Amino acid sequence: MRGSRNLLTQRLASSRATGSSGGLKFVGATVGAVTAGAAGVAGYASYDNEFRKKLEGVIPGSRTILNYTIGEEEPPAPRLKDLRPLQYSADPKVPPKPFEPKPVKKELIGVKENLKETTEPKKIEKKPENPYIGAKTPLNPQERNEKLTESLKNHLTQAEKATKVATSAKLETIRAIEHHVQTIREAIEAGKDGDWDSVTVAHLKAKRLAEKDEKAEKLARNAVADLVTEANLGGQGETTQLNPLVPISKATAEKLSNELDEMISNVKHVDSERIFVHDYSDRVAESRRKFQMELKAVHPNLNYEDGMKIKKADLHTILAHAHLRIDQLSQKLIDSKLNEEKRIQSIIAKKKEDLLEKLRLETNAKQAAVIPEFDKKKLDAELARATAEIQKKYDEKLKEVVRTQKQLYDIEHAKDVDEAVLKERNLHSSAVGKALAQLAGIEKALSGHLQMDIENRKSKQMWLATQNLKGTVIFGNRASCCMEGRRAPLGDQMKTLLSCCGGGNSDEFVKTINTAMSKTSKVRGEYTEQDLNTRFNKVCRIGRRVAYVNEGGALAHLYSWLKSSLTIELVPKKGANESLTPAVENNFTLLTRAEQLWKSGKKSDAIRVLQLTDGATRRVAADFIADARRQHEALLLSRLLLAHAALTSIRSTY
C-alpha cells in the first residue's frame, strides 16, 4: 500500500508544472495527476485483493468502476490443504473414485451458472466389469495374464510420467514462491525505492504455476487411481491373482502417492514463509504509521505525506524527534537492564539467606542429637544383652515349633510317602525292564543281521555263478573257432555253484538241479544257440533230400534226391500255431513246418515236429534232436537257478 502511495505522489510530483504558465496548464496537470493516481490505485487493487475490498467498502460505487477497468475479482485459488490424497477403495470389487479437487463456491466468483446444469440429474456410474473374473467366451489363462501384464505396464508408464510432470510442476511452483518471497523482502528492505512491480509479476507467476501444478497433480492422481483399479481387478481374477505385477503395481502406486503428498507438504512449507513475509511487511507499515502519528501528536502543523517535499526546518524537527525517540528507547533499555540486574541480585541474596538458614537448622539438629560417650556405651551394652536374650528365647521356641510340626508331618504323610516311593519304584522297574527288552531285541537283531549279511553275500555269489552258467549254455566257449570246441563243460560251474551254497547240503533246490542235469552236459557241454541254428539248417537240407526214402537202398536214395529236387516247396497256409495231423503230413511238409517254428522262436515245438518224421529223415535228425533237447534242458535249469538265486537275495535283504 505504501508503494502505491509513493507511486501516486511521484506521478503527482512529476506532473506539476515547473512554471506558472496559466490556469489551463494547471487544470490539465491536475486531471493528469488524478488520472495517474486512479490508474495506480486500480493497478495496486488488481494486485492486492484486501486493498480492493477496503477500497470498495470506503468509496461507494468504486466496485463498478473497478469491475469495468480491471475486471471482476478473481475467485480465490483453492488452498493446498483442500487437496486430498489418493483414495483407495476398501472393497476390491469397487474401484476407487478418481481424484477431484474441492469445488470452489460460486458465490465467491460471482458467476451464476445455468439452472439447467444445476438441475440436471446425476448419472449413476455403473461399476466396471472385471474382465479377469469370467467371460461369456472362455479365454486362455495365459492370454488373460498377458493382457493384464500389458495393461499394468501401460498404466505404470502413464502414472510415472504423470507423477514426474506433477513433481516438476510443484518444483517450479516452489521456486516461483521462493522468488516471490525474495522480491517482497527486497522491496521491504529497499523502503521508498522498492520495486513493487517485480513483486506483482512474481505473484502472478506463482499464481499461474500453482494453477498449472494443480492440473498436473489431478492428472497424476487419476493415473495412479487407474493403476490401483487395474491392479485390484487383476488381483480378483482366479488365473491372474498370482501375477507378479499386481503387488508391484500397488507398491508403486503407494510410492507415487507418497511422493505427491511430500511435494504438497513442501509447497505448503514454502507458502507459509510467504505468509510470514506478508506479516513482516504489515508490521513495518504499522510501525511507520505509529511513528507518523507520534509526529503529528508532537507537531500538529507538520505537513508529512509520502512523496511530498519537506522543508529543511521540518526535516530538522523530524530528525530531532527521531533522535529524542531513540534516546528515550535507549534510556528505557538501560533502565530495563538495570532493573533486571537488581532483580537478579535480590533473588541471589534471598537464595543465599535461605541456604544459610537451612544450614543453621541442620547444625542445631545434629547438636541436639549428640549423646554423651559414656551413656552411649552403657545403652549399647544393655541393648545387646536384651537382644541376645530375646534371640535365644526365639530360637528355642522356633526349634520346638519346627520339631512339633515335623512330627505331625511325619505322622500324617508317612503312608503317602511310602505309596509314592512304591509307585516310583514300579515306574523305574517297568522302565528298566522295557529298556532291557529293547536291548535284547537290538542284540538279537544285530546277530540276525550278521547271519543275513552272510546269506546275502552267498546269494549274490550264487547269482553271479548262475549268470555265468546261463551264459555258458547260450554262448559256450567263445575263444574256440570250431563247433565242438565251443562246447564248454558245465560240471566245474555246477561245483562252484554248490560251493557258494555251502557244499550243496544247505540248499536242496540246487542239489536237485545238479542231480537232474545230464552227465553229458557236465562232462562235454552243450552246443551254442548259433551252432544249433547251423545244424538245424543242415539237417533240414539233408532231410529234404532223403524225405522220400523209407528203408530202401542206394536207388531209393537217388530217387528221393531227384524227387525232392523237382518238388516245389510251398509254404502252408495254416499258421504256425495250428495243430498238425500226422496222417496227412509227410517228411517234406513236416520239415517246412519245423523251419517256420524254429524261425519264429518256438524251438521246442520245432523239435517235436522233427520227432514226427520217419525213415532216413528221422535218422538224420536223431542226433540233432537229442542235442537240442539236452541244450534246452540245460538252459531251463540255468533259468530256474537264476530265479532261485534272485529269490534268495530278496529274502536275505533286510
Swiss-Prot record:
Q: Which residues lie on this side of the membrane: Mitochondrial matrix?
A: 13-20
Tissue spec: Expressed in the gonads and muscle cells.
Single Gene Ontology BP annotation? cristae formation
Q: Does the keyword Transmembrane apply?
A: yes
Phenotype of the disruptant? Egg-laying defects, defective oogenesis in 23% of mutants, reduced brood size and increased resistance to oxidative stress inducer paraquat. Abnormal mitochondrial morphology with mitochondria appearing larger, thinner and connected with large pores in the outer mitochondrial membrane. Mitochondria also have elongated and curved cristae that are stacked with a reduced number of junctions.
Key words of the record: Cytoplasm, Membrane, Mitochondrion, Mitochondrion inner membrane, Transit peptide, Transmembrane, Transmembrane helix
Family indicated by similarity: Belongs to the MICOS complex subunit Mic60 family.
Q: What does this protein do?
A: Sustains mitochondrial morphology probably through maintaining cristae morphology. May act as a component of the MICOS complex, a large protein complex of the mitochondria.
Name of this chain's protein: MICOS complex subunit MIC60-2
Task: Report the source organism.
Answer: Caenorhabditis elegans
| Classification lineage | Eukaryota, Metazoa, Ecdysozoa, Nematoda, Chromadorea
